């Protein structure tokens, strides 16, 4: 967000519209970038951990043991992780948005001379609740996608460490790809419903 603020201010300076960098930063961060970058980081960090954990349990035949004692592995291993992701990703998105807007405020202040009060006033004027919710609505869906992809890849692990490494890599790549596609689909959906 720091670089977007700096580059946005640099380009808008040519038109005498530097103050509109606040609108650019606010809308872009809250609507698109905040949730997308958060989901990508979660896919890399937590998605890989979920795949590795479930995959190593599969390698040691612990999942088969769960089935033998009458427990459903999806209910015991997958569902709690999905719930945790659905709670964590929106919370982390809010934190990421706050940090990015704070960084945008600092860059706008030091680089463009936009006072913090002006930044906050412009942010209040240019951002409404629909902008905030446009990003936050995506977060649980992205969390579910990350959790499902990570769990499925973990369940595919064979009996070797090589298989585990391959599935962890596949989990991260597929999760990031699906999250980006999902973000694009949400953007098209929002345009279609004028949200």
For the regions a protein language model found, what residue spans apply to each?
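Start (N-cap) of specific transmembrane helices in multi-pass transporter permeases
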Residues: 73-93, 171
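Membrane-embedded translocation segments of transport machinery
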Residues: 14-58
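Membrane-interfacial helix-loop-helix connectors in multipass membrane proteins
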Residues: 5-30, 98-140, 144, 148-170, ...
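Short cytoplasmic-facing helical segments at TM-TM junctions of multi-pass membrane proteins
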Residues: 53-79, 161-164
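Hydrophobic alpha-helical transmembrane segments of multi-pass membrane proteins
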Residues: 9, 37-38, 43, 50, ...
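Short, small-residue-biased leader/transition segments that mark boundaries at the very start
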Residues: 1-2
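Hydrophobic positions within alpha-helical transmembrane segments of bacterial inner-membrane proteins
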Residues: 40, 44-45, 53, 85, ...
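Final/C-terminal transmembrane alpha-helix of multipass membrane proteins
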Residues: 164, 172-188
